[in-house]
From Swiss-Prot:
<dbReference type="InterPro" id="IPR050098">
    <property type="entry name" value="TFPI/VKTCI-like"/>
</dbReference>
<feature type="disulfide bond">
    <location>
        <begin position="31"/>
        <end position="81"/>
    </location>
</feature>
<dbReference type="InterPro" id="IPR002223">
    <property type="entry name" value="Kunitz_BPTI"/>
</dbReference>
<dbReference type="InterPro" id="IPR036880">
    <property type="entry name" value="Kunitz_BPTI_sf"/>
</dbReference>
<feature type="disulfide bond">
    <location>
        <begin position="56"/>
        <end position="77"/>
    </location>
</feature>
<feature type="site" description="Reactive bond for chymotrypsin">
    <location>
        <begin position="41"/>
        <end position="42"/>
    </location>
</feature>
<feature type="domain" description="BPTI/Kunitz inhibitor">
    <location>
        <begin position="31"/>
        <end position="81"/>
    </location>
</feature>
<dbReference type="InterPro" id="IPR020901">
    <property type="entry name" value="Prtase_inh_Kunz-CS"/>
</dbReference>
<dbReference type="GO" id="GO:0090729">
    <property type="term" value="F:toxin activity"/>
</dbReference>
<feature type="signal peptide">
    <location>
        <begin position="1"/>
        <end position="24"/>
    </location>
</feature>
<keyword id="KW-1015">Disulfide bond</keyword>
<dbReference type="GO" id="GO:0004867">
    <property type="term" value="F:serine-type endopeptidase inhibitor activity"/>
</dbReference>
<keyword id="KW-0722">Serine protease inhibitor</keyword>
<keyword id="KW-0964">Secreted</keyword>
<keyword id="KW-0732">Signal</keyword>
<keyword id="KW-0646">Protease inhibitor</keyword>
<feature type="disulfide bond">
    <location>
        <begin position="40"/>
        <end position="64"/>
    </location>
</feature>
């Protein structure tokens, strides 16, 4: 395997580890990211996990980019980050 292929594999494994909870008490690392509305101008209701308050909160999402700590429903947020 070429060095580029190995580097890509290492990057994918690192990303997978960051997005996968270690146990039921832990949550994915992206749950620690702040709410990010992104650069677009939409006004969509979304939810993010707030690690300081240890709960999911509502925010306005612009509709593009942002980060993985953005959920369409509070249930999805809680299931992913607050469980």
């Amino acid at each position: 395997m070429s060095s580029g292929g190995l580097l890509l594999l290492l990057g994918l494994l690192t990303l997978w580890e960051g997005l996968t909870p270690v146990s039921s008490k832990d949550h994915p690392r992206f749950c620690e990211l702040p709410a990010d509305p992104g650069p677009c101008n939409g006004l969509f209701q979304a939810f993010y996990y707030n690690p300081v308050q240890r709960t999911c909160l509502k925010f306005r999402y612009g509709g593009c980019k942002g980060n993985p700590n953005t959920f369409k429903t509070i249930e999805e947020c809680k299931r992913t980050c607050a469980a």
